[in-house]
Amino acid sequence: MANIKKYAPIIHEGVPDLNPESVAYREFWDEQIERCKNGYKPNGMDAISGKHYYYLNFYKILGNSGEKGGRKSLIAPWYRDMDREYFNLFETCKDEGKGMIVIKARDKGFSYMNSGMLAQEYTFYP
């Protein structure tokens, strides 16, 4: 579990408390924009796409925080290998100008992933 936290540093480490006028502040946000656009590869781990990085770090979904009997609330998405495969396949199809059909069960988070991809696209490519 500790390793997958590397995919979502904003969620697990937070945003550093930097002076908005400082060079360090600008460099931090430039790095986040770069990761959201072009993807991210933590040391010793597989790369994730920019859309997936944005989804894991800056998007919120309605879900259970893990408490028994708790109500759903806005949470950060969890990293799942299945999601990484979906985001990667989406990028491949987009690059090749092809469509995609997915056979899946209900309640697997695909509506959230797709809306996250739209939010990333709208945020960085208006």
Give the ranges of each region predicted by the language model.
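Phosphate/NTP-binding elements of NTP-utilizing enzymes
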Residues: M1-P126
